[in-house]
Amino acid sequence: MKKRLLTVSLAALAALSFSVSGQLQANERVGDFALLDHEGLFHHMAWYDNRKAVVLMVQTNSSSATQQALPEFQAIKSAHADDFQFFMLNPLGESRDSVAASVSSQGHGIPVLIDDAQIIADALDVRAAGEVLVLDPRSFQVTYRGPVSGLTNALQDIDAGNAVTTPSLAVTGETINYPARDADMARTISYTEEVAPILAENCASCHREGGIAPFAMDSHAMAQGWSPMIREVLMTKRMPPGQIDPHVGDFTNDYVLSVDEQQTLLHWIAQGSQKDGDQDPLAMLEWPPTEWAFGEPDLIVKVPPQSIPATGVLDYRQVVVPFEGVTEDRWVRASQYIAGDRTVLHHTLNSILPPGSNGGRSFLGGNNPDEPSITAYIPGAAPYHEPENTGGLLRAGSQLALQLHYTTTGRETVDESEIGIWFYPEGYVPEKRMSGQCACIFTPTWTNIPPNDPDFEMAQTITVSRDAYLHSFLPHMHFRGKRMRFEAQYPDGSSEELINIANYNYNWQLSYKLREPKLVPAGTKIVATGAFDNSSQNKANPDPDRSVPWGLQSWDEMFFGAVSWQYVDQGPATEVAAQ
């Protein structure tokens, strides 16, 4: 099977175009791609397949060629904006602030896609500032390249349904250089020393036998065989999953490859994905024999088996599970939810029911911070471990209330999930607690998302009442969720962007953890601003013609922006401290 896969994939690799092997010819396929613009907005070329073409003009901040071409480019955009999508492309990876300042000073308002790693410009074979390229967003072929003076004729040809008469014209302008590419292609990139460590660190934990990914990246042969796919998912930013804007904040789980890592992988693929040395680091990786992230749990809570039919829409299920075996109060330091059948369990919410509780608890937090945080199941989420010296008290006799969301897959199955819980040593009482709040919108203030709206915004604000350290951010929307940003508005009138989830993906609902907790003063407002894509361009959209209400099911929508923090003066609550 692997040999056949390798043969097929190498044939596909040979068909890919890399500008390092020579200049790109007219109508040659470059592949799909995605980039963030100077405002941090995500643009995926395939999303624009309802346009006749995507038009790109090469921009650099100090380029006279860009300045000279800009007025005509703007005029053409004004004449053709209904049928064509216009961008500028910065192939030098210049800083976002400097590009934004350039856009502001020139007053054109055209989104500038910033190619930090030069991998898109290289694939497009961008050669000079001021150069214009026309990309077919369905075939991903460059149908015209040349000066702006030839653009009108090219667009008229495309508008008439004809091939571009003159697909390539010479262009003058400052030469675009590729120092990292040229340096890499002048040597042989080492699979064992350079490539395998990147794949091991960023891919192999999911792409392994028994992992959640669809194939195991456990050898050079597999990496080489899948190299065309690796290139495609890097170009479109589909993998690693759950990526956020790397220019905003510093997170432990941003899942963004560095510029150097992206270049190393793609240049290695361009060289033929060759192996060096006698050993294969990927084949030597060893994984724990258990899925439990922190060793064998101190307590395993078994969720009652849930029978899932082959078809149909399932109501949310409410289950209450006792913490069997907990005969004395214990402080919780970590927890993990292992789904019995990931194909049907979409997500869970949970809440602790203390002894004597009547069950009327919120699934959205905001309860006593002395209570423990038991992790829910969210696609792609990592097991939860409290910050150092932080925890909540699980009282003997407590129960766990679970809300389970299942989807059907065409086959009957039974989900038998488990929740692992790890305690602090007996007698140890952590000094700190976690708090937080959700910037949520519910039915009383919900505004239905209009039909066919590609970018419908919502926003909600929460206030941090005391000095606090921010720890994490969790966005939650459904199929139409597009993006979400969190911004701090400080009491002195200043503001700061905290995180930009530029390409929200319903399949990867992650809680993003700051590498270093961020101190904010009392009275800080945190604004979560998100947008929904209810257009037919959103391929996951169940019904673009529908006015979308708030609702629990995935074809309805939600808006949650959860924030976790730790108050500076937050120690044990009076009730617990007194015990």
Predicted regions mapped to residue ranges:
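Bacterial N-terminal signal peptides that target proteins for export
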Residues: 1-10
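N-proximal helix/coil linker or "cap" segments that precede and/or mark the start of modular domains
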Residues: 16-32, 158, 165-183
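Structural micro-motif
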Residues: 31, 53, 108-111, 126-133, ...
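Short active-site neighborhood of thiol/selenol oxidoreductases, capturing the structured segment around
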Residues: 46-67
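Structural microenvironment flanking redox-active thiols in thiol-disulfide oxidoreductases
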Residues: 65-106, 113-123
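Thiol/selenol-based redox catalytic cores and closely related redox-interacting motifs
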Residues: 115-177
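Aromatic- and Gly/Pro-enriched helix-to-coil junctions and flexible linker segments
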Residues: 168-326, 330, 347, 397-403
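Beta-strand-centric surfaces of beta-sandwich/beta-rich domains
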Residues: 241, 246-251, 281-331, 336-469, ...
